[in-house]
Amino acid sequence: EEEMPICIQPVKAQDLKYKLGIWVRDNTQGIGTLTFLTKEGAYGALGHGISDTDTGALLKISQGELYEAQVVSVVKGGRGTPGELSGYIDYSEGKKLGTIEKNQENGVYGMIGIQEQGKLPLCQMSIGYKQEVCTGEAEILTNVEGEVKAYRAQITEIFPEHADSNKAFSIEVTDETLLGITGGIVQGMSGSPVIQNGKLI
């Protein structure tokens, strides 16, 4: 709990009483994809920050919790339609995975406990540096069929000096199975790990 002194100018309403209009947002929630987890339990997810739906500003968070989620349906994307993964967050006992400690432009970050890591489909992998990324074949790890699977993709363009670090390269789904299910990359797939030459990029 935090107290913060502020000055507000009330407005006299038609009933001649002074009133304040106050807008408070004390929580937010959403479904995203886990990108990486270190041996120490630090994780990164989502691939972009959580923004206020009304203002578009990056939300400042004091604390958060990470829970298991399930994808229950896919709205296929197409021309003029972004498509999305629909699912639910399981807040039941024992489904909490960890904490959310930072909300930044490139994603949300926090810690996952040792015991909770055992629930996740993990595999150890090297990190690819940006100078190692090249155009050509790659894979996207994502869950659209009830489990995490690798799907073929193509890195079509690289932007090494792009001002927005979220736009380091362009990727196109080439896997016929994934195209048949989602039509390409849809909302909810942000943060899906991209693998090239056996490394997480």
Language-model features: where?
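C-terminal recognition in membrane/secretory proteostasis and scaffolding
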Residues: 1-201
